[in-house]
Amino acid sequence: PPPGQTERLTTRPGVSVPIYAVWRSDARATLVLFSGGAGGYGQIGSDSWPAGGNFLIRTGKRWAHHPFNVIMVGRPTDGIDLSLGRNRIDTTHLEDNRALLHAVRERSPAPIWLIGTSMGTISATASALADREALVAGLVLTSSIVAFKVDGAVPKQDISALRIPTLLVHHAKDACWGCRPHEVRALARHLQQTKPHRLLFIEGGGTPQGD
């Protein structure tokens, strides 16, 4: 697919959040991707696509092959450390994400789905729960942070209050201490009030790597 473009969105006074955006006139949905680790999408490579190694970023071209707007969320310019879970549930981060959602909605009427992986699942969940304007149509969490020792871990948030379609995707042999598969099953049980919801375990693949 043709590459997207980098944009800067003003989210707070004196602060902006860069995004890498692929816009399509035939988009059926807008996918807002929250990467793991400290967030962001890395540098732009020679092919004009983000070169970050995170799962959601390195698969960006695959998303763009389908009729979706694809938004990869960068790091705010004031240097908030998004490797810390507490910063991903803080009002400042949520304010940034709310401004981002408004900017996306102004650009396209397509339903907005938030997708997070690893630490990005904290951001995606918190932003969905903070949405009081029905901007978010659905939520996808991959390799969810479920360890209670992590501030903002998904099961520590009020996920039973979610009222949007929610999909949990997890590798059956995820070896990360923060993403243990058996704890994801417990997480899914807290989504009983969320209609529809689904837990999908996958197996196989290449050599494991951290995201």
Where are these regions (language model features)?
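N-terminal cap/lid segment of alpha/beta-hydrolase-fold proteins
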Residues: P1-D26
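Short, surface-exposed "cap/lid" segments of acyl-processing enzymes
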Residues: R24-R62, H66
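Alpha/beta-hydrolase active-site loop
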Residues: F55, L82-R107
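Conserved alpha/beta-hydrolase
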Residues: G60-I80
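Primarily recognizes the serine-hydrolase "nucleophile elbow" in alpha/beta-hydrolase
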Residues: H102-A161
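The feature captures the conserved acid-bearing segment of alpha/beta-hydrolase catalytic domains
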Residues: G138, S143-G204
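Catalytic histidine-centered segment of alpha/beta-hydrolase-like enzymes
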Residues: G205-D211
